[in-house]
Amino acid sequence: MRADQILPDDVNHGQFDGLTIRKGTVAAFLANARTWTRADADERAQAQSQIAEDLPALRALGLFEVLEIRDERLRALVEGL
């Protein structure tokens, strides 16, 4: 399956498991995960807040059913939220 079969180029949101999810949510999670694992306290807090906000969408997409977070601290954070 191609990305445009999930969300065409002209569509920015989709319904998945009853949630409206914005295109780019997975990419934003990856960016925030990188920041969280490498950042100072202020950046880390901002990244953690965004990760927590996006978790329902990521779970609705089934992201963690097929991928496992390798960083133990980040995995514990996500599992605890």
What function would you assign to each model-found segment?
Residues 1-13:
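Short acidic, Pro/Gly- and aromatic-enriched capping/linker segments at domain boundaries
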Residues 55-81:
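Short, compact, well-ordered microdomains
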Residues 23-46, 56:
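Short, surface-exposed, low-complexity cationic segments
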